[in-house]
Amino acid sequence: MRLLFAIALLGAVFAEDAWKAANVDRTIDATSQIVKVSTLYSFENVGNGPQSKVLIALSKEESATLSFISAGIDGSKGKLKISEKPAEKDLAVYEVDLRTPVAKGAKVTIRINLRITQVLEPLPSKIQQSDSQFVVLHTSAYVPSLYETVTQKTTIRTTQGGKLLSATTVSPSKQETERVIYGPYVNIPAFETKPVKVHYENNSPFVIATIVERFIEVSHWGNIAVEEYIELVHKGAELDGPFSRIDYQMDRRGRRQPALQQFTTVLPAQAKDIYYRDEIGNISTSAVRIRADSVDVEIRPRFPLFGGWKTSYVIGYNLPSEEYLYSKGNQYALKTKLFDHVFNDIVVEKLRTKVLLPEHVKRVKVATPYAVDRRPEELKPTYLDTTGRLVLVLEKENIVPDHSQFFTVTYEFEFVDMLREPLLASAFFFSLFFVIIVYSRFDFTISSDPAKDAEERSQIILGNLAKSVDSKQSAYEDLIEASQQYKSTKNDADLQEAKKTFIAARNQENSTLTDKIATLKTDSGASAAEKASELLKYDKTVFDAVDNYLKAVEKSTTKTAGTEEQQFLNKVKDARNRADSVLASI
C-alpha cells in the first residue's frame, strides 16, 4: 500500500515538473451574482518526453462554490475531459486530458471557464429601498498554479456605471472605471497566492432558486407535458425598513434597482399551452413572445423581489413528442433538457428532475452531459394503470445556466402496451352498458309481492279505462261535427253513416270498459269496480238523448244550436267531467 502511494506521489511530482506556465491571462467577470472566470493558460512542455495531461489549480474557496468547469484548446472546437484530483497544499487540483500529446519543448494554449456561485458578500448586509447594493469579492491577485508562472495577469470586471469603493493594491495593479487589473507579474513560484478584496457596486438581483422541481410526462400518443415548480429567494442585501410602492414606481434607477422586477424564461420553440401560476392562481402579468428558435415567456411577479424576499410559482407547457421522442422498433429515446432557462444568471441550489415514462417500459438507461445523482425510481399510478408508471428521479445541486443541456433516456416499449389502455377503457364501458341493459330488463327480486303486483295491474287498468273514456268522447265529438256539417249539406245519408259509426265505436268501448271493470273488481275489490261502473251509467244518460238530438238537427233551419241541441252538448260535457271525477276517485 505504501509503495503504491509513493508511486502515485512520484508520478504527481513528475507531472508537475513536466510543465511550465509561460503565460496566464485570467478575467474575472463579477458583474452579476455568478462569478465567471475565464483563464487562458499557455503551457510549455519542459519534461523529458511528450505529455498528454496537465493540472489546473483552484483555491479551496473557489472549489467549494464551483458550479461549472469546462476546458478546451484555445481556437479549437470541442471540450477537453477534465477530472478532479486530490488536493495539494490547500489547492484543489483538476486534471485536463489534452487528447493529443504535446512534444517536449512545444507549447499548448488551453482555456478554462469557471462558474462560481454565492461568493459575493453584500456589504452592508442591509440597505434601504433607495440605496444601491455593494458587494465584496475575495480572490487572489496571483492565479493559483501547480507550476512556475513566467508572466500572468488578472482582470476583474465590475458593474458598468457602478462605483468602485476599494480594491486591495498589489503592485503592479491599477483601478479603472469598471475594472481592476492586477499584473502583469513575472516569475511567480508554484502554489503562490496573494489575497485581495474588491468592494464595488453591484445592483444585479441576487435571486437564487432554492428548489426547481421539473416534471416531464412522456406519452406515446403525441405529447410530452412539462411542468416546473420554482421557489425563488433574493439573497442579496436585505431590505431594511418598509417597502413603498410609490417610491418604487418613482425610482429613476428603473431596472438598476437591486430587486427582481421581471424576467424572461426561454422555452423550446415547439412549446404550446403555456401556463404560469402561483398559490393564488393564474398570473396575468406575463406575456409570450414567439421567436424563431424559442418561446420567450416574460414574467412579472405580483411584487418586486427585494433582499430577503421570496416567492414561488409553477410554469408548464406541452411539447410534440415527434420532436423529442425517437424510436426504432421497440427502442425509444427521449432527448430533452434537464432544466429550462429560468432567467439570465440564475443559480439553482437544488434541481430535481422527474421523468414519468409509460407503463411497462423495460431496460431504462440515462445518459447525462455531466454527473447527476440518480435517486431510487418511483411508481406513480395514473388513469387505467395496473402497476403504475416508472418515474426516474435525477438530482443535482448548485446549477447555473451552463447546465441547461440535453440528456437522453432510452428504454424499450412494446406497441401492444400502447393499445392496452384504450382497449381496457373500451372493455370497461362495454361492460358497464351491458350491466345496465341487463339490470333494466330483468327482475332480480327473490319473491314477488302480491299486493304490489295487484296495485300495478290496477294502475294499468285505470290507464286503459281512461283511454276508453277518451275514445268515447272522441266518438261523441265526431258525431257532433257530422251534425254541424249536415246543417250545411242536408245530406241524410252522411248523417246516418255518422250515427252508425258512432254507435259502433261506443259499443266497442263499452265492451272494453265492461271487461276492465270486471278485472278491476278482482284486483282492487268491489268498491273500485262499483265506482268504475258509473262510467257506463253516465254514458247511457247521454246516449239516450242522441236520437232527440239528431231529430232536432234535422229540423233546424239555422247553423246555430237550438235549445235541444244545446242541452245535448251540455250533457256530453257534463258526462266527461263526471267520468274524470270517477277516475280520480278510484
From Swiss-Prot:
One of its GO terms (biological process) is protein N-linked glycosylation via asparagine. GO terms for cellular component: oligosaccharyltransferase complex. Residues 443-586 are cytoplasmic. The keyword Nucleus does not apply. The chain crosses the membrane at residues 422-442. It is a single-pass type I membrane protein. Disruption phenotype: RNAi-mediated knock-down is mostly embryonic lethal. Embryos exhibit cytokinesis defects which lead to arrest during development. Embryogenesis proceeds more slowly and embryos are osmo-sensitive. Defective localization of the yolk receptor rme-2 and impaired yolk secretion. May result in chromosome segregation defects. It is found in: Endoplasmic reticulum membrane; Cytoplasmic granule. Its main location: endoplasmic reticulum. It comes from the Eukaryota. Residues 16-421 are lumenal. Keywords: Endoplasmic reticulum, Membrane, Signal, Transmembrane, Transmembrane helix. Pfam families: Ribophorin_I. Pathway: Protein modification; protein glycosylation. Belongs to the OST1 family. Subunit of the oligosaccharyl transferase (OST) complex that catalyzes the initial transfer of a defined glycan (Glc(3)Man(9)GlcNAc(2) in eukaryotes) from the lipid carrier dolichol-pyrophosphate to an asparagine residue within an Asn-X-Ser/Thr consensus motif in nascent polypeptide chains, the first step in protein N-glycosylation. N-glycosylation occurs cotranslationally and the complex associates with the Sec61 complex at the channel-forming translocon complex that mediates protein translocation across the endoplasmic reticulum (ER). All subunits are required for a maximal enzyme activity. Component of the oligosaccharyltransferase (OST) complex. This is Dolichyl-diphosphooligosaccharide--protein glycosyltransferase subunit 1. The gene is ribo-1.
